[in-house]
Design a protein with these regions (language model features):
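C-terminal motif of bacterial Sec signal peptides marking the signal peptidase cleavage site
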Residues: 15-18
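Kelch-like beta-propeller repeat domains
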Residues: 20-317
């Protein structure tokens, strides 16, 4: 969707070139490994927007709409009621931001506000007050990065900065409202995905510009990285989430759009392909609620193709 270096492609050029030279493989998924079911769709189509869970509700801010415009709107999904509502819009529109929940708040880091360079600004959203508050900016402006919470701190990893694709890794301390730079990711990439399992942050896939199968894990306690088994299918523009101590990598983009759902088991350092997404997508959000994973929005074609799709995956137990 975004060419390395921050250049936003037009819809027609993006569709023609997509974002890599890898085509989705034709090998088959394992349909009996996990179950998918449809849930209530988003109120409006969007893509390039991660999501985050706070107290039984999934918050989906910003992204591109169906016309390819950057939006500031916030949609909120009540998991128990299977119903979407709108919340207070962000102070400014964002696409390709990092989104993470921490301490009952939703943090939005970086992203693009338009076709210009990446932003470093950070906001948090208070669900109880329905208010957005600016926080200290990231040291390095970035978009198409990942943002996760581990050990009470927020990590912003990889993405596109003003000089191109980076492996930058910065940590935010909410108590002091300060960022620090820690050990960089060994493989710089953007349009990557990440999830936390135990004391490690697993970072998977991405591109720079070709698609990566790379899986690397960051250990905050030792400020070090581990290189792990490659994902079977190299993908950028994917989403990831953890459930039952395993990592799941969904979708992605090449000249086509991936349906793939691949599972990584840290105990064996091994991958397997499980039940594919019913709707192939890229640039979506993935959020774990209980044992299930909700995969929300995203583009159904390479480039622009925002959708309202909300599908729930329940892994095997």
């Amino acid at each position: 969707m975004v060419w390395p270096g921050g250049l936003l492609l037009s819809a027609s050029l993006s569709l023609a070139l997509a974002c890599g030279d890898d085509r989705p493989p034709t090998d088959q998924s394992q349909p009996g490994i996990g179950v998918w079911d449809p849930r209530a769709p988003l109120l409006s189509a969007r893509q390039e927007m991660p999501s985050a869970l706070v107290n039984g509700r999934i918050y989906t801010p910003g992204g591109f709409d169906a016309q390819g415009a950057t939006v500031a709107t916030l949609e909120i999904y009540d998991v128990a009621a299977d119903r979407w509502t709108t919340g207070t819009s962000m102070p400014e529109g964002r696409n390709h931001p990092g989104v993470v929940a921490a301490a009952g708040l939703v943090f939005v880091t970086g992203g693009y506000t338009s076709a210009g360079p990446p932003s470093a600004s950070v906001f948090d959203f208070n669900p109880q007050l329905q208010t957005w508050t600016p926080r200290r900016a990231m040291p390095a402006p970035r978009a198409a990065h990942v943002t996760v919470e581990s050990g009470g701190k927020i990590y912003a990893i990889g993405g596109v900065s003003t000089g191109g694709v980076v492996g930058t890794n910065e940590v935010y301390d909410r108590a002091t409202d300060r960022w620090s730079t820690v050990a960089p990711m060994p493989t710089p990439r953007e349009h990557l995905a990440a999830a936390v399992i135990g004391d490690r942050i697993y970072v998977v896939g991405g591109r720079a510009p070709g698609n990566f199968a790379t899986l690397e894990a960051y250990v905050p306690a030792t400020n070090s990285w581990q290189t792990l088994a490659d994902m079977p299918t190299a993908r950028g523009g994917l989403a990831a989430a953890a459930s039952g101590g395993k990592l799941y990598a969904f979708g992605g983009e090449a000249p086509g759009v991936f349906p793939h759902n691949e599972e990584y088991d840290p105990s064996t350092n091994a991958w397997r392909r499980v039940a594919d997404m019913p709707t192939p997508r890229h640039g979506m959000g993935a959020v774990t609620v209980g044992n299930a994973i909700y995969v929300i929005g995203g583009g159904t074609q390479a480039g622009f193709g925002a959708s309202t799709v909300n599908e729930r995956y329940t892994p095997p137990r």
